[in-house]
Swiss-Prot record:
This is Queuine tRNA-ribosyltransferase. The gene is tgt. Its EC number is 2.4.2.29. It comes from the Bacteria. Substrate binds at D94, S95, G96, G97, F98, D148, Q191, G218. Residues 249-255, 273-277 are annotated as: RNA binding.
Length: 379
């Protein structure tokens, strides 16, 4: 029996977006969903109890960072990631591939894996499909990701073709090295950049390997949003209807809605907590930078339409004061609000799918948020 099972519930008649549920060894979560990112086994400044209060059913942790600190063997000795961080709901771990390609100044890609330098101290390291599986098996996440090559945008067709072929070979090695398929589901990652032919080849290779789920990788790496949407339009239909589909590294409100419309079930991004640390908040009226001087005497909530802990209890003026004084509590309040905003947005997306009106919801939300305006400020 597979560790991960996707239950299809319904399709939106207006857009084709799908409502579903993913069942894991640590509970089920409704889709489409957003996964808060807990890189180092913590969602920055948030407690597990606060994440549960927001109704987060799954979070993401990072294989590369946990391998370096504290080390996957320590996490294994603690009883796995769930016990180590006191989180009894689902966890997804990425493979470390993206970090190897984005954080390391020096790297050498060979067929056996990638040689690179530790971004913390410069030590030489080596990560392979087998090592990525060993680390993730020790971490004990519910969903683990295959080790893939993450080419930058833009890349030539020739380079991307070689990269896709290598990613497929690595995916097969990941399947062979995976030691715990009965309680950890391994997802394959479709690559291919903006090239339809290569996406088609990558999807065909991976679907033939019968992974329990599939991710679309290599997007949200600097390409314009219209390219991302176009790639999703020709990639998502290549993936099995009875498996979850995950768009990696995407977390802006407009992209979550547009991704759901194109058949995506799962999203993750550091965006909500990263921008929160600079005082940037997502609200139903659009982007709000609470550090701005105009909020010094504004005693209203960050978002009058939000019922989160932050908005029910604290004013813009108070949060601005905390942020200007570099008080950690200010970052906690903005982080809580942004995470709640995205998780609540996904609940609204699911409700719109239930009611067959996601296209209308998108139009209303984009208008209210200001995404339709020329020169609209995005994240």
């Amino acid at each position: 029996m597979t560790a991960i099972r996707y239950e299809f519930i319904k399709k939106c008649k207006q857009t084709g977006a799908r409502l579903g549920r993913v069942h894991t060894p640590h509970g089920s979560f409704d889709t489409p969903t957003f996964m808060p990112v807990g890189t180092l086994a913590t969602v920055k400044t948030m407690s597990p109890e606060e994440l549960k209060a927001m109704d987060s059913g799954i979070i993401l942790s990072n294989t590369y960072h946990l391998w370096l600190r504290p080390g996957h063997e320590i996490v294994r000795e603690a009883g796995g990631l769930h016990k180590f961080m006191n989180w009894d709901r689902a966890i997804l771990t990425d493979s470390g591939g993206f970090q190897v390609f984005s954080l390391s100044d020096f790297r050498r890609i060979e067929e056996e894996g990638v040689y690179f330098r530790n971004h913390l101290n410069g030590d030489k390291l080596f990560l392979s499909p087998e090592k990525a599986m060993e680390i993730q098996n020790a971490l004990g996440s519910d969903i683990m990701m295959a080790f893939d090559e993450c080419p930058p945008f833009p890349a030539t067709f020739e380079y991307m073709k070689k990269s896709v072929e290598r990613t497929s070979r690595w995916a097969e090695r990941c399947l062979n090295a995976h030691q715990r398929p009965e309680d950890q589901g391994l997802f394959g990652i479709v690559q291919g950049g903006e090239f339809e032919e290569l996406r088609r080849q990558s999807a065909k290779d991976l679907v033939s390997m019968d992974f329990p789920g599939y991710a679309v990788g290599g997007l949200s790496v600097g390409e314009p949003k219209d390219i991302m949407n176009r790639v999703l339009e020709f990639t998502t239909p290549l993936l099995p209807e009875n498996k979850p589909r995950y768009l990696m590294g995407v977390g802006s409100p407009d992209s979550l809605i547009d991704g759901a419309i194109r058949g995506i079930d799962m999203f993750d991004c550091v965006l909500p907590t990263r921008i929160a640390r600079n005082g940037t908040c997502m609200t139903s009226q659009g982007r709000l930078v609470v550090k701005n001087a105009k909020f010094a005497r504004d005693f209203g909530p960050l978002d009058p339409n939000c019922d989160c802990y932050t908005c029910k209890n604290y004013s813009r003026a108070y949060i601005r004061h905390l942020m200007k004084c570099d008080e950690t509590f200010g970052i906690r309040l903005t982080s809580y609000h942004n995470l709640h905003f995205l998780l609540n947005l996904m609940e609204q997306v699911r409700q719109a799918i239930r009611e067959d009106r996601l296209g209308d919801f998108r139009e209303e939300f984009f208008e209210q948020y200001g995404f339709n305006k020329p020169n609209a400020k995005n994240f």
